[in-house]
């Protein structure tokens, strides 16, 4: 997979190095030469750039990357402007780092709904989530195994767990299935959880499936979706 990480402070550099070590193609960008020079041997490609300059940003391979992560934390203004430029250039998968509720609100207003909050999520876990497409949540069991929550693929809706055959096809264990139950007009929505569901379970619209297994197998399942 290919990623661009903009902003190589502690969070951004940790994320970029983690992705590089896992064999992904990474372009790391910072506006400080000192940071670029310090990280040149730890990240696949690293460059100095002012990403608030639209013409400079246009030189990046934006359409040939799986995600662009704006990890700028010190300068909120630069973060917002950089994200606005990426949005204007119609980059498909943009992830913005947020540092406050107000920052998140502004990003939502400019159409950046995919955000991360490093103070509550580690760079390693965000690295995992970037690798497993469509994952709603990832919990690391050990260096090889994870538990992942996915929205059930549309093609599985109205079909049984046995038909999906995740165990044989992907060597993944279905731990639980979460179902959103909509109540009446005056009552709230409720999420019910089915632990260790039977093979006869029939998937419903908006179900969330919780599966456990090797990270590599999760990636294969995610690609199929």
Predicted regions and their residues:
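Glycine-rich adenosine-cofactor-binding loop
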Residues: 4-19, 152-157
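Cofactor-binding loop segments of dinucleotide-utilizing enzymes, especially the Rossmann-like FAD-
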Residues: 8, 31, 99, 179, ...
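Short, flexible, solvent-exposed loop/turn segments with mixed acidic/basic and small polar residues
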Residues: 136-141, 198-201
